[in-house]
Amino acid sequence: MRNQNQPVAIEGYPFIGLFAFITLVFALLGWSVCTLLFLGLTLFAAYFFRNPDRYSDAEDAAILAPADGKVVYVGPALEERYFKSEVTKISIFMSVFNVHVNRVPMAGKVVDMFYNKGQFLNAAMDKASLHNEQSGMLLEHTSGRRMLVVQIAGLIARRIVTYPVVGDILQRGARYGLIRFGSRVDIYLEDDVDIQVTVGERVCCGETVLGFLK
C-alpha cells in the first residue's frame, strides 16, 4: 500500500516540485513578488498533501472515520448496488484545509470495487452522493459484516486515488487512498451498528470512532 510512511503523500510531489522549480526560477531572475507567490503555493501544496501518522487503540468492533472533516449526514439511505435495501449512511465532507489521505474504517477483505464517472457538484450537497465522480470499495469483515466506502469528488476535486484491488486484506486505519482538493466520503453500514457521531461533528481520519459493530 502506498503512502504508509511518507510525511507528504507522493501524489503531491509533482505539484510541490513544479511550484518549487518555478519559485527558484523567479528567485534567480530577481522577481520577488512572483518568488513569494510561488513559494506560498509550494508551501500550500506541501500542507495540502500532508500525510500525518494516526493511531487508535479502540476495540476491534469500532469503525473509524475514513476521512478528516465534518459529518454532513447520518441516517437511513437506500443502497442499490450491493445491499439493495435501506441501510445506515454516514457522510463526511472534506474542505481544502483538511488532510485528504483516506484510511480504512474497518479491517476486512476487499470483495468488490467500482468507479463511476460523474459530475463535480459541491461535495457538501447530498446529491453529490448520486451524481459526482466516485470510487467505491466493498469491505467484508471476518464476522461476515459488510461495509461500502465511497470516495466522492467535489467541486474542486478532480482526481480520486484508490490503492487496493479486489482480494486485498486491509488493516483498519491503513492509508488506502486520497482525493485532491475538497471532497467527500460516504460509508454505508448494514444494520446492528451503534452510531457514535452526529451531524455537524468534526472527525479525525483513523482516530474518531463513528460507531461499533454489535
Curated annotation (Swiss-Prot):
List residues, modification Pyruvic acid (Ser). Answer: S183
| Gene Ontology cellular-component annotations | plasma membrane
Which pathway, metabolic or otherwise, does it act in?
A: Phospholipid metabolism; phosphatidylethanolamine biosynthesis; phosphatidylethanolamine from CDP-diacylglycerol: step 2/2
Note whether Nuclease occurs among the keywords. no
Offer one example of a GO biological process linked to this entry. Answer: phosphatidylethanolamine biosynthetic process
Cofactor entry:
pyruvate
Q: How is it modified after translation?
A: Is synthesized initially as an inactive proenzyme. Formation of the active enzyme involves a self-maturation process in which the active site pyruvoyl group is generated from an internal serine residue via an autocatalytic post-translational modification. Two non-identical subunits are generated from the proenzyme in this reaction, and the pyruvate is formed at the N-terminus of the alpha chain, which is derived from the carboxyl end of the proenzyme.
Enzyme nomenclature, EC number: 4.1.1.65
Annotated signal sequence is none
- One of its Pfam families is PS_Dcarbxylase
Q: Which reaction does it catalyse?
A: a 1,2-diacyl-sn-glycero-3-phospho-L-serine + H(+) = a 1,2-diacyl-sn-glycero-3-phosphoethanolamine + CO2
As for subcellular location, the record says: Cell membrane
Kindly give the membrane topology term recorded for this protein: Peripheral membrane protein
What residues make up the catalytic site? S183
Give the site residues for Cleavage (non-hydrolytic).
G182, S183
GO MF term (any one) = phosphatidylserine decarboxylase activity
Q: How is the cofactor bound?
A: Binds 1 pyruvoyl group covalently per subunit.
Q: What keywords does the record list, in alphabetical order? A: Cell membrane, Decarboxylase, Lipid biosynthesis, Lipid metabolism, Lyase, Membrane, Phospholipid biosynthesis, Phospholipid metabolism, Pyruvate, Zymogen
Which family, according to UniProt? Belongs to the phosphatidylserine decarboxylase family. PSD-A subfamily.
The role this protein plays is: Catalyzes the formation of phosphatidylethanolamine (PtdEtn) from phosphatidylserine (PtdSer).
Note the subunit structure.
Heterodimer of a large membrane-associated beta subunit and a small pyruvoyl-containing alpha subunit.
Q: What is this protein called?
A: Phosphatidylserine decarboxylase proenzyme
- In which organism is this protein found? Syntrophotalea carbinolica (strain DSM 2380 / NBRC 103641 / GraBd1) (Pelobacter carbinolicus)
What phylogenetic lineage does the species belong to? Bacteria, Pseudomonadati, Thermodesulfobacteriota, Desulfuromonadia, Desulfuromonadales
This chain is encoded by the gene named psd
